Regions:
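Coupling/switch/interface segments within P-loop NTPase motor domains and analogous charged loops
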Residues: 2-5, 105-109, 115-460, 612-695
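Switch/communication elements of ASCE P-loop NTPase nucleotide-binding domains
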Residues: 6-86, 446-591
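Conserved small-residue
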Residues: 14-26, 30-32, 37-52, 56, ...
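Short, flexible/disordered secondary-structure transition segments
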Residues: 91-92, 224, 489-493, 534, ...
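Short alpha-helical segments and helix-capping/turn motifs at coil-helix boundaries
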Residues: 93, 99, 195-200, 550-551
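Short alpha-helical "patches" and their helix-cap loops
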Residues: 98-101, 106, 492-503, 600-617, ...
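Intrinsically disordered or highly flexible coil/loop and linker segments, enriched in small
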Residues: 171, 222, 474, 491, ...
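C-terminal lobe/lid and adjacent interdomain/linker elements of RecA-like ASCE P-loop ATPase modules
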Residues: 522-667, 672, 677, 683
């Protein structure tokens, strides 16, 4: 699939901001209209072949970049894309907040059309303020598809559509307050035009609506960093162990060493308090208690009968049963196929729930058909019980390799003599189920390879997952989010309420945020590598499109010119110089709208010397006075210039300036001092190298 581009015809000022009406292609693409037979790219393009580096990747995978200076309209363009998809979904899907866990709100104020391609066919969504039309197909069969209720008549449209996963960690982005107009005199907001963003941050609708944005933001664009870190830690521990079982590194330079976990005695009280507050408008506190108790009672019967395990610690046993009941209720509140069994949408009195209804829900959860992301955490808890991890009152530390081996041995004991023994784990779910459930505090210790110096080999150091730097966390969080969602989307099964998506659109806004240049340089490669390790079933996920909004020349050097959208002052502009594998310095100056290739302080200092040199003949006395007053300073500036050519040029200029008032003897003395200084620097460098070799 490809996001071809957006045709912007107009909109409210606070929506389109500085973007001008026109065609905004996500590459060297033309607008696919009837007049050009819906052809949108030059024939024979091989750009996608660049990214087929691993066999398990989908058949089609494309990478595009959006580039421009601050204020050029990059984020606004993405917000237009989000608005169009949001409005399409809000018209297409039933908007029951009780069922989907999120309420999509139509976002008015935009006149634009989004063009995309899936399976070789062009589609588009026309959004003119509150009017939305969907088109798919070309020439004779290109007719608008009616968006109608109920979903059963609409979800066929989604079979050709794509699921968008967007990540943006900037604290100033996607703030609903930024869309509201303010009355200067009263200080009051005159509208709430940013509320449409709320629905896009919720992800618990079973991947029904075709978009999710991460990380989750509360009102005012606030990111709960503590919660995000905890969710990310669960994903990362799973991924590190998964790849370790395959003798691979999830991230180059990092391998899992130990897994540590400790029982959280306050889990039940803390979780129940928060959950009751979240669902207070839908369920009373007493109904929450009654429903959880009803589900927990049934789970206790199952555990006593099938697992034959009891726990000596009543707090641990109580927490396990609470967790199973609580997660069962959450599933009913979130997913319609479960909630309708007890009519949760109009639920009023838990005393009327029957034993048969409870049994039906729990059996549905335990069925093979529902062994997916919806029931994953319940299955994790059951797996924990099956494997007999019961002595959990004290903190436990286990070696990562031993943890994997122990669980593989446990699995293999149930295989027949004809079955091939497992030597590794293949999927995210398999490993996630092995980890302690959320009523444990968990952490992981990693081995990290560190380069001590240029002349020494890398050594291993131990570091806790929770102690990684912000840049390391950002890299890991970003990539783990993507893998987590791809895995979940692939597990969705078709029913009367859900249509699985076959195409995925990944968006990274300010992808290099917090990244060291080395992380920037390898970002696209690491992303593709990890996607390949998702073991994507090409029958389920047929294509992936990646859009990266970036200020990094390292990222841009991995993308060909034909796949780059340049923005300048709210307009699409064209560049002619190729980017793929280009020199980083050339990319910075040619493709990032930079006036100068160095910092402004450095430019001003050098400009002062160059200006002095240029006026040496017309104002000789002033030049000599400046040199006399600042001789040591100019020597210092010359000594710290890094670029060899620039350094030699400034050296030549200063020599000519000094010679204006020097006798031949003075000139020779100055040149001797310079030579002696150079020799001293060389001696110091030799001494340093000899010292390193001895160590």
């Amino acid at each position: 699939m490809h996001i071809i581009g957006i045709r912007l015809d107009g909109g409210k000022e606070n929506v389109i901001k500085n973007l001008q009406p026109g065609w905004y292609p996500f590459g060297d693409f033309v607008e696919p209209v009837w007049e050009n037979n819906y052809e949108w790219r030059k024939p024979g393009s091989m750009a996608e072949n660049l990214y087929q580096t691993c066999d398990p990747l989908p058949r089609t995978i494309s990478v595009s970049c959006v580039v421009g200076a601050n204020g050029s309209g990059k984020s606004t363009l993405l917000e237009m894309l989000f608005r169009i998809i949001n409005n399409f979904a809000s018209e297409l899907l039933p908007n029951s907040e009780d069922y989907k866990g999120r309420k999509l709100t139509f976002a008015e104020g935009l006149d634009a059309q989004l063009y995309f391609e899936t399976d070789g066919t062009v589609g588009s969504i026309l959004n003119k303020d509150d009017y939305v039309r969907y088109f798919y197909g070309t020439n004779k069969d290109r007719q608008p598809n009616e968006i109608r209720d109920p979903l059963r008549r609409n979800y066929k449209i989604l079979d050709n559509f794509f699921y968008t996963i967007s990540t943006n960690y900037s604290i100033y982005s996607l703030n609903d307050d930024d869309y509201d107009s303010l009355d200067i005199q009263t200080g009051e907001k005159s509208s709430n035009e940013g509320k449409w963003l709320y629905g896009l941050f919720h992800k618990n609708d079973g991947y029904l609506a075709p978009i999710t944005m991460t990380p989750y933001r509360q009102e005012g664009g606030i990111i709960d960093v503590t919660n995000e870190k905890e969710l990310a830690r669960q994903r990362l521990m799973t991924l590190f162990l998964l790849f370790e079982s395959q003798n691979k590194a999830f991230i180059n330079g990092y391998r899992p060493l130990e897994l540590e976990y400790c029982f959280n005695q306050n889990y039940k009280n803390d979780t129940l308090k928060i959950y009751k507050y979240k669902v207070r408008k839908k369920l009373s506190s007493s109904n929450v208690d009654s429903l959880i108790n009803a589900f927990s009672k049934r789970w206790k019967e199952i555990i006593n009968k099938e697992f034959k395990c009891a726990h000596n610690n009543p707090i641990v046993e109580e927490t396990i049963l609470f967790y199973l009941g609580y997660k069962t209720l959450k599933i009913c509140m979130t997913y319609e196929s479960f909630g309708r069994i007890i009519n949760i949408e109009s639920f009023s009195d838990a005393s009327f729930i029957s034993k048969e209804q409870v049994n039906t829900i729990i059996e549905k959860i335990r069925s093979l058909e529902e062994d997916n992301h919806i029931t994953l955490k319940i299955n994790q808890c059951l797996t924990f019980l099956k494997r007999g991890y019961l002595a959990v009152e004290n903190p436990i530390t286990v070696n990562a390799k031993e943890f994997i081996k122990h669980n593989l041995d446990f699995d293999n004991q149930f295989l027949s003599s004809e079955d091939k023994k497992k030597t590794k784990y293949d999927t995210y779910d398999q490993v996630f189920k092995l980890l302690p459930p959320p009523f444990f505090f968990c952490d992981m210790t990693l081995h990290r390879r560190v380069q001590v110096s240029e002349t020494k080999k890398k050594i291993k150091e131990e570091i806790r997952l929770s102690r990684l730097s912000s840049g390391e966390k950002q890299m890991l969080f970003n990539l783990s989010y993507v893998i987590y969602h791809i895995k979940n989307i692939q597990s969705v099964k078709k029913d009367e309420y859900r249509m699985p998506y076959r195409h995925i659109n990944l968006i990274f806004d300010e992808a290099e945020l917090y990244f060291h240049p080395e992380f920037q340089r390898s970002f696209v490669s690491e992303l593709l590598k990890m996607i390949s390790w998702c073991h994507i079933d090409r029958r389920k996920i047929r294509s992936i499109n990646i859009i990266i909004v970036t200020h990094s020349p390292f990222v841009l050097s991995d993308v060909p010119l034909e796949n780059i959208l340049y923005l300048e002052d709210g307009r699409h502009v064209k560049k002619m110089q190729q980017t793929f594998s280009a020199n980083i310095h050339e990319i910075l100056q040619s493709h990032f709208f930079m006036k100068y290739p160095m910092g402004e302080i450095a430019r001003e200092v050098l400009d002062r010397i160059i200006t002095l040199y240029g006026k040496r003949d017309e104002d000789r006395e002033r030049a000599l006075k400046d040199l006399s007053d600042n001789k040591d300073y100019y020597y210092y500036v010359e000594s710290i210039i890094a670029d060899p050519y620039l350094k030699s040029t400034i050296h030549r200029m200063l020599n000519e300036l000094y010679s204006l008032d020097e006798t031949p003897l003075q000139k020779l003395h100055r040149e001797r001092e310079e030579t002696e200084s150079k020799l001293k620097n060389i001696d110091n460098q030799i001494a340093e190298l000899e010292k390193d070799e001895k160590n």
